[in-house]
């Protein structure tokens, strides 16, 4: 069966994440210890025990999600002889998850990936003062209608399309006032709209200071060609070229995540199953809304790991 392996982004973090996996598999415990050591931080304790308020901070949530995903990959490798180059036709990650995908595919070491996403989280949080920015999900509009709403709402401020998640689920990001106007305009057009509980306006032009920091961070990073083609967020196209991947990771900081198109690329290339690796079930749910011909599963708990091993 042809499979794509995908990796979740911010929003999927919850206290207790990874704890059952660490209890069941020594390989997962070892992975969490490696991340703790790379960051000089007891991140695994924060993941397992909270407090939730600290885990939700962008600079902690991002490496925590990376660690949760890579722990699953490590267990599959150690317990089942999993080789991503043989088992995956593609890898992709939603926003932060793109770094997890690259590490899983051998382009980044665990330590390098952990340090990069910690720096990314800090840079994104500092780019815009708390309260200045906001994000909202527009539900029931197609991409062109959402773009028209964002343009009308801007009024000299920033209101960009941040995520094209699935048909009828578009996220906008920018100045709080502009995003609130977008919510009102979307509702006037018969859509539902929800302000999102985020600490910064991700994937919009207000993140330019963070993009500058990531340009510097990635220039200092040894990134190898992934062993599996990456479907990049901002291109919704495959790449395996390290210099191009670095540029796309920088662009991803300020540009829209083209998730719907990425999943359609899987379907167009005869992928049959999309496997979400790590915390939560967000991406598997989106896959099913994008293309019902694709099967999708989430793998983060010990029983889910064991079930996947049976079919690989």
Regions found by a protein language model. Name each.
Residues 260-264:
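Short hydrophobic/charged patches on amphipathic alpha-helices used for structural packing
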Residues 311-312:
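Post-His helix in hydrolase/transferase enzymes
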Residues 1-146, 196, 273-306:
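FabD-like malonyl-/acyl-CoA
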Residues 10-13, 39, 105-255:
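Alpha/beta catalytic cores of group-transfer enzymes, especially the acyltransferase/condensing modules
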Residues 3, 7, 237-238, 259:
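Short, flexible segments with low predicted structural confidence
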Residues 267-270:
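Non-catalytic positions within long, well-ordered alpha-helices that form the structural scaffold/packing
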Residues 27, 254-258:
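Soluble or luminal CAZymes and related metallo-dependent hydrolases
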